[in-house]
């Protein structure tokens, strides 16, 4: 469905093309795909916003004071296909009656419009059957009660997740919620359009809203709308750069530390995405490394789904489930290209053993899967120390792997203490370095003995 929205094939509406993607985040090129005039994540201005913002925001918004209110979104750019020769498009929609999200069992009555701009609220997502129509393809979705949802546990990410799955090709705006201090987090969830409301309120109260959170200006530092716009613009530029380079998750984790609420949103989002089954299907285009630098990143859905797959679905290649050899990981990927693993392979002297690398946060990486995403692309800080959670995860995965296969011998060269019921695990390290001469000789001897005894 996303492809149906993209590019310049539409006869009307908003021309846009996906330039980069990172999970739910997108950089959309706005206008003619051969020469986009703007990119998302971007700003949307209101009539009372500072001039500096009006000059860099590709969208403008206005809202009537009627009940229900009418929302208008337009642009000074020529974004309407196929010719892209006149300013536009101009979208209008009634917001309808919006009740507080806490009244999720209530029906607001008069619903909002359904068209090129689609205003949504928590109630509408629960009660409006017209949203199920297959040919409903909005250009912009506006989550009108985003601020209220952010104050209620888990509801914001639930609403965004539903919207991004139902309307993947629509731009998403969460009015009043975005700012330079949370742009990376919201973009990671899938938000595309940001307004100046919070940044403006901060300036009015004598504070600057920056990518690192709100702060009081330093002595001699100007606290003005112009400075606030600069901080906002730089924050969105950093977000776009992170999407393009595949590092948005890392930036979002850093920015989530600006407030407890952002950490809460990240955790709820991870739990929600972990329930889906499509995260590991696609290697993000242009991404040659994924960083798992913090304990928070260990809860990312790419990790959780890998752990679940290895623990419950992975099947050892035929005739290899006889001797299990546990090996340490290496910084270089794929592992076999590293100096240490070349030594291990030489010491083993056979490909008849099932080689499995012990690592964090993925837990276990079988040799036959070392070239796939994310196993071949992750990077972690290496200290040689294991946390309690890491030890529990790895030991649990080893036990699950052993329970589902017919191993007769387990050789442990990983350096981790492992006890597995029903097995006398052979420790070939015995406290020495994995690449030491004695440890490698013990590895060779253990494999040779297993081959002779298990013929």
What are these regions (language model features)?
Residues 36, 186, 246:
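Conserved, mostly hydrophobic/aromatic
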Residues 208-260:
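Active-site or pore-adjacent capping/gating segments
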Residues 97-223:
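Glycine-rich phosphate/ribose-binding loops and adjacent secondary-structure elements
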Residues 5-114, 288-318, 330, 335-348, ...:
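Non-catalytic, usually N-terminal nucleic-acid engagement modules in DNA/RNA processing proteins
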Residues 252-275:
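Terminal amphipathic helices with adjacent charged low-complexity linkers/tails
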Residues 274-406, 414-415, 435-453:
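Positively charged, amphipathic N-terminal segments that serve as targeting/anchoring signals
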Residues 153, 183-187, 207, 335-341, ...:
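A short acidic (Asp/Glu
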Residues 48-52, 63-64, 83, 102-104, ...:
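Short acidic, S/G/P-rich loop/turn micro-motifs used as interaction or catalytic elements
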